[in-house]
Regions:
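HhH-family (HhH-GPD) DNA N-glycosylase catalytic core used in base-excision repair
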Residues: 1-169
Length: 169
């Protein structure tokens, strides 16, 4: 993938507006790849670009870095930003089992629990949240709760909630 980005192998998609997945067009893929290319050219890595981007959370930093690109949830939107949260978890947590942990500039304590419908339902059943909308605010509320139990790594709570939901259908 890095070779694909650094060598502009994605350039064929620039003017291709055909859909390839749901609401995403090849041009959207071009935009994401081109922004990543910019990050590697200017900062040397996506991690360094994220360090240099403003935002209260790492999710907001990614949103700000890719602000005008289709497929990246907008900061003011109602998305739970699950894919962004998952990506950050994979890159930052260093458990060497599920997560890669190759970014050392950030702490697992900065992560937000990736929120999907199952985790949301279990969190509601357990009284962790009363919010009915599975959005980033709900993900933050669940994360804040998990920080009371796992202050250094609130995403550990994601495994517990997800596992409970899977095993107790």
């Amino acid at each position: 993938p890095l070779h694909f980005i650094l060598n502009n192998k994605y350039s064929d998609y620039q003017n291709n507006y055909n859909s390839f997945y749901r609401f995403f067009k090849y041009h959207d893929l071009y935009e994401i790849c081109d922004r990543m290319h910019y990050c590697y050219q200017k900062f040397g890595s996506l991690e360094s670009a994220l360090k240099s981007t403003s935002g209260h959370t790492l999710v907001q930093r990614i949103q700000n870095l890719f602000i005008d690109i289709n497929g990246i949830p907008k900061p003011e939107g109602n998305s739970a930003c699950k894919r962004i949260c998952m990506f950050l978890r994979w890159m930052i947590r260093q458990d060497k089992t599920v997560d890669f942990g190759i970014w050392e500039s950030f702490s697992p304590s900065e992560l937000i629990v990736p929120l999907d419908t199952h985790v949301h339902q279990i969190a509601k059943k357990c009284g962790i949240t009363q919010r009915s909308t599975p959005d980033i605010k709900t993900a933050m509320e669940i994360t804040d709760f998990m920080k009371q139990i796992f202050p250094g790594d609130p995403c550990l709570g994601d495994f517990a909630l997800f596992g409970y939901g899977i095993n107790n259908k």
